[in-house]
Amino acid sequence: MRLVVGMTGATGAPFGVRLLENLRQLPGVETHLVLSRWARTTIEMETGLSVAEVSALADVTHHPEDQGATISSGSFRTDGMVIVPCSMKTLAGIRTGYAEGLVARAADVVLKERRRLVLVPRETPLSEIHLQNMLELARMGVQLVPPMPAFYNNPQTVDDIVDHVVARILDQFDLPAPAARRWAGMRAARAAARSFGDAA
């Protein structure tokens, strides 16, 4: 499998980094990474990692302005793309076909080739414009996976919350997520809640 991973300047860089770490552990998955200019700043602020360290998690890293990159052409076969986190600017550009920069261009290619496109939009609150853009993209077949925390699995740390969101992203591509703590029914949930309460 060959996946394109885009990261933009919206807050939520830990989700993108954790996704890359997971994908790197999966045999047969080739990753192509594009970091927007502001993603580079956000990564350093939110993760403490350098751009070089994050880039090293991918098989191939493309410059954000390289419109001649392989992933800017539909003839370069991929299985899809995920943008995590996805800024509202990038989301709006994808919705309107305004492919400024390689992140948006690669997404435009995935759309026109009818491949799987997953966006992880990071903004709150959402305006009517944001919601309209997301609705139109959903109608085009784009998967929108907002990084919303789940509490039925009793997360103990921020890492637990990040892992859950990343597992849901991996699910969109039918890829395994070993760290996922999945819903196992009400009985298991109640037992976990009691255990959590006892520990507290």
Curated annotation (Swiss-Prot):
Q: Which conditions up-regulate this protein?
A: By vanillate.
- Asked whether the UniProt record includes Transferase among its keywords, one would answer yes
Q: Give the matching Gene3D superfamilies.
A: Flavin prenyltransferase-like
Which GO molecular function annotation, any one, does this entry have? flavin prenyltransferase activity
Q: Which UniProt keywords apply?
A: Aromatic hydrocarbons catabolism, Detoxification, Flavoprotein, FMN, Prenyltransferase, Transferase
Stretches assigned to coiled coil: none
Q: Which reaction does it catalyse?
A: dimethylallyl phosphate + FMNH2 = prenylated FMNH2 + phosphate
Record-listed FMN binding positions: G9, A10, T11, S36, S87, M88, K89, T90, R122
Task: Return the broad EC class.
Answer: transferase
Q: Transferase: present as a keyword of the record?
A: yes
Q: Which GO terms describe its biological process?
A: catabolic process; response to toxic substance
UniProt EC number:
2.5.1.129
Describe its function: Involved in the non-oxidative decarboxylation and detoxification of phenolic derivatives under both aerobic and anaerobic conditions. Flavin prenyltransferase that catalyzes the synthesis of the prenylated FMN cofactor (prenyl-FMN) for phenolic acid decarboxylase.
More details:
It is not known, if phenolic acid decarboxylase forms a complex composed of VdcB, VdcC and VdcD. The term subunit is often used in reference to the operon, however there is no experimental evidence to prove the existence of the complex.
Family affiliation: Belongs to the UbiX/PAD1 family. YclB subfamily.
Its assembly, as annotated, is:
Homododecamer.
The identity of this protein, by name, is: Probable UbiX-like flavin prenyltransferase
Q: Which gene encodes it?
A: vdcB
